[in-house]
């Protein structure tokens, strides 16, 4: 079972790099580009970790 990580980052280049690395390591990654979306994703997905 993959661990879920929510990445909160407004810079799309940085968030893409983080997603690529974590995907390769077997994590299920969700990206939120602002605080409002981060709260929505957190409540919906209940991630194991928020970065």
Task: Pin down the residues of each PLM region.
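Charged docking surfaces used in two-component/phosphorelay signaling
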Residues: 16-24
């Amino acid at each position: 079972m993959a661990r879920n990580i929510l990445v909160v980052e407004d810079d799309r280049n940085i968030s893409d790099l983080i997603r690529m690395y974590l995907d390769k390591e077997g994590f299920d990654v969700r990206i939120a580009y602002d605080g409002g979306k981060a709260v929505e994703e957190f409540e919906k997905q209940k991630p194991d970790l928020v970065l």
